[in-house]
Amino acid sequence: MLEYELLGIVDGVATYQYYPDGDRENPGMVRFDSNFKMIDYTPSKEDPGAYYASKLFHWFERKGGFKEAGFIAWG
């Protein structure tokens, strides 16, 4: 599971903080452009291989829009 929240959008760039497995002690950060392409990321300590950052990127790419906050669950 992955929780995320929008920190802000500046000049068409959305910045999100994400929390692998809901761990708010060790957030990561991802920035997307207005075409839903990842610009850069800072992985969480719980996400050294950027697995969760990649999940978030693909989620927004498929949805075609940004949300304020939410979670993604998979099985």
Where are the regions a protein language model picked out?
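Sparse, context-dependent recognition of short Cys/His-centered cofactor- or disulfide-binding micro-motifs
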Residues: 1-3, 15-17, 51, 56-59
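Acidic, low-complexity intrinsically disordered segments
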Residues: 29-75
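N-terminal start-of-chain detector that recognizes signal peptides
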Residues: 1-5, 43-46
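N-terminal acidic leader/helix
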Residues: 2-30
